Each structure stands twice: as C-alpha cells, then as structure tokens.
C-alpha cells in the first residue's frame, strides 16, 4: 500500500492513515476491509471473512510506528497552505497542489478551488471588505488577517479572535467565510466563553465549533 502512496502513523495512541483517495490523514483503519476484499495477494477464500479481517487489522495496527512529531508536522507542513476539496492552495507557490502524504492535513475543504476573474475578486472586495469597513486600509488589514488565519500564520491554528464594536461588520465577514469554508471555519461569539448562572452552558454546547481551523 505504501508503494501506492498510502502512509500509516501513530500518535498519542491513535493510528492515522493517509489514503491517496482521500488526500488527508484520517483516524482508524475501518476502510481497510475494502482493500482486503480486493487484494490479490491475500488468499481468495479468506480475505472476505470478518474474523480474518479483524485479525489482519489488529496486526497492521501493531506494526504502525509511533511518531512523536506527528502533531508538530500537522502544524508546520500545512503552514501557508489552505485546504480545498480538489487540493490545497500553497500561498508561497501561489498555485493549487495535490494532497500528498508529506503534507499532514487532518481536514479537507468542502469546496473546490477555482481561479476567479478579476471582476469577481473586485466584487468580493467591494461588497465584503470595502463595503463593510468603509476604509481601504482597514479593509486590507482585515483581508490579510483572514488570509493569515486560514493559511496557519497564527500560533493556535484552531482559534482566531476578531475584536470590534457591535455592528462593525465583523459578523458579516466571518459569516461569509463560514459559508464558504463550511468544514473548516465556524463563528463563535465571545460571550460564549463567559460563565453564566444557568442550567446550561453555552460554551460547552458550542465547543464543536472550535474544531474548525
């Protein structure tokens, strides 16, 4: 499988599998069963049996080496790269690249990347930035801040704080990003981090939103 571009690694007790068909590192080996069923190197009369597949899966898991640098690789190899459905955009090379096992993405984008015409870029700039913030310098700062956040140029790649007055436009722009990058980007109101004397906990109920990049 490694000859076909697959890779297996272990971190903190979890096994991660890079499958070229998916392009990212996913936990678990459940889908190995499909490969076992189709593998010509395995005995034809045994490769489809569940108990045999269970044993093979456990054996494969035991052979996977632990990588103490895995979490660091997730951060550093995806630096200045933005995940899309059809590949990742490299902000340094300024082009779309194919997913590969040397780049440790754990999530894939929900939309395809496609170069846009200048008139589309101008429309986005005028409506979502200049039209919201009203000042070219502020708009440029906000655009660059979002770009750096999406490309990993922040210490914590999970959370990016935007500070501003009510009705300043920050909600509009973050909602636009959430709609575009559905699988990676979510908005979370700062008040959800505040302690509240109630029978519920808004921060706890919304903790899944922080899982976006």
Task: Give the predicted meaning of each segment.
Residues 6-22, 26-30, 76, 88-211:
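P-loop NTPase catalytic core of nucleic-acid-dependent motor ATPases
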Residues 49-88:
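Extended, Lys/Arg-enriched charged tracts that mediate electrostatic binding to polyanionic substrates
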Residues 33, 37-41, 57, 61, ...:
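Generic solvent-exposed, charged/amphipathic alpha-helical segments
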Residues 1-5:
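Intein-associated homing endonuclease modules of the LAGLIDADG/DOD-type, together
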Residues 16-52:
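Short, small/acidic-rich helices and loops at N termini and domain boundaries
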Residues 9, 44-52, 64-72, 137-141, ...:
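Residue-level signal for secondary-structure boundary elements
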């Amino acid at each position: 499988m490694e000859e076909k571009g697959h890779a297996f690694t272990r971190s903190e007790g979890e096994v991660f599998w890079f499958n070229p068909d998916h392009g990212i590192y996913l936990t678990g080996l459940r889908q190995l069963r499909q490969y076992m069923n189709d593998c010509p190197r395995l005995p034809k009369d045994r490769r489809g049996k569940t108990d045999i597949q269970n044993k093979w899966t456990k054996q494969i898991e035991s052979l996977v080496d632990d990588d103490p640098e895995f979490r660091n690789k997730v951060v550093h190899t995806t630096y200045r790269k933005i995940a899309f459905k059809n590949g990742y955009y490299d902000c340094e090379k300024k082009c779309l690249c194919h997913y590969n096992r040397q780049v440790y993405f754990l999530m894939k984008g929900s939309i395809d990347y496609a170069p846009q015409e200048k008139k589309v870029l101008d429309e986005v700039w005028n409506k979502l930035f200049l039209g919201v913030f009203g000042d070219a310098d502020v708009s440029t700062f906000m655009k660059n801040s979002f770009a750096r956040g999406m490309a990993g140029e922040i210490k914590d790649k999970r959370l990016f704080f935007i500070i501003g007055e009510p009705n300043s436009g920050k909600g509009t722009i973050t909602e636009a990003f959430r709609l575009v990058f559905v699988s990676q980007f979510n908005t979370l109101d700062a008040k959800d981090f505040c302690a509240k004397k109630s029978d519920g906990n808004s921060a706890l109920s919304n903790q899944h939103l922080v899982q976006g990049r």
